[in-house]
Amino acid sequence: MNYGTNRFYGGVDNSDHRNTIAIPRFVLAFDYKFNSKWILGAEIEFEAGGVGIETELENSENGEYETEMEKGGEVALEQFHITRLIHSAFNVRAGHLIVPMGLTNAHHEPINFFGTSRPEGETTIIPSTWHETGLEFFGSFGKGYARFDYQAMIVAGLNADGFGRDNWVAGGKQGLFEQDNFTSPAYVARLDYKGVPGLRVGAAFYYCNDVTANADKNYKYSSVGRSSVKIYSADAQYKNKYVTARGNIIYGDLENSSKISKVTLSNNSNYYHGAMPVSYTHLTLPTTERV
């Protein structure tokens, strides 16, 4: 399976009167069944053309051409996991997994959100698409109007180095370097109600006991102390052949944010910068789409 999006921008407010066109991402995904109980899943994402050598026209430098050693995009392993199906109510998955916080992460394909871009509310304050390495237990229980799906996970926790003023904890997901820091893992739980045809109502909780322990240079946070992060989300979607309606709420709380801010501000890095508020609340009002 593959999916991607193409975007065209007409720069009417640009003094150069230039239009741009780009393919932000292209994704290849596949599942392989060893047998009826064991399944291998993988998803590889190419963003902004991937990596390689490119030539750019630098209009700000008298129209000079420059050859860059790498593009601004990336090739990322978004998912790679092995699943053991045991029972409809209890199954196990291990590997690189999607963290099911919010409405978009678990349903991030372009057909699952309105417009050409993912919702700003979620993508601004939490990672998107959020994927970490760990272990997951999942299943379904109940039947009829009392049917539920659940997920319980232990994954690599957020890295405090990536927290910032503009995006709260969105820059803190692991994967920047070759190895992920697993000193303080995160615990994730999600429950979805699916008893009514076309309706999905879900709630999720994320907890990491100490995000500073996952920092790449955690000795810089010795004066900060243990700093946990909690994120809560609730979302709902109703869909039939005439209309689609979606809504979600995200709330988060970070301990010792002012102290962490001082450390991240002092990090002389191209990757991490900025200060953050203690907590951030986002409410996405229900939206609808007629089809």
Language-model-detected regions and their locations in the chain:
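Single conserved hydrophobic/aromatic residue that forms the stacking wall/gate
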Residues: 282-291
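Anionic group-transfer/hydrolysis microenvironments
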Residues: 97, 250, 286
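Outer-membrane pore/translocation modules
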Residues: 4, 106, 116-117, 149, ...
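Outer-membrane beta-barrel translocator domains and adjoining extracellular loop/strand segments
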Residues: 5-12, 52-59, 73-76, 106-111, ...
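Outer membrane beta-barrel
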Residues: 1-4, 15-160, 183-188, 192-200, ...
